[in-house]
């Protein structure tokens, strides 16, 4: 029941999106950050590459989960394969890791800047 309820909410989110909007909604932002945070939480190592435009989480199986910019979206790839859109309508992404915390800054197509931070559990002895 919980899964179908969550799925219905996500489908509604994408079907009800206004096409003329050049950015993304707050709900899309929150879902995307939650996905990235969960990958980092379940990883044995987290690092950035390409001057912060790529966030790489190495999971317990040794797979590299990579979040990078592709056209106007952030996508997720596993070991360089696949293509899962995470957040659309972006122009820039910058990730840093400081003192066990991922600092993420994203600029949308409508020139808004979004920032967040979340702990990297592998640095803190968890995960």
Curated annotation (Swiss-Prot):
The keyword Membrane applies. The transformation pili are flexible filaments, consisting mainly of the major pilin ComGC and smaller amounts of the minor pilins, including at least ComGD, ComGF and ComGG. Interacts with ComGD. Interacts with ComGG. Transmembrane segments: none annotated. It is a peripheral membrane protein. This is Competence protein ComGF. The keyword Membrane applies. NCBIfam families: pilin_ComGF (NF041002).
């Amino acid at each position: 029941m919980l899964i179908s309820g969550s799925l219905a909410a996500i489908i509604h989110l994408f079907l009800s999106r206004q096409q003329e909007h050049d950015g993304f909604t707050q709900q899309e932002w929150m879902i995307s950050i939650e996905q990235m945070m969960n990958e980092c939480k379940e990883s044995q190592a987290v690092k950035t590459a390409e001057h912060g435009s790529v966030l790489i989480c190495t999971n317990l199986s040794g797979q590299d989960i990579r979040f990078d910019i592709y056209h106007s979206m952030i996508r997720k790839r596993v070991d360089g394969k696949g293509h899962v859109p995470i957040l659309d309508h972006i122009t820039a992404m910058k990730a840093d890791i400081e003192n066990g915390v991922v600092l993420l800054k994203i600029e949308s197509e409508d020139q808004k800047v979004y920032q967040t931070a979340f702990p990297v559990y592998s640095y803190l002895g968890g995960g």
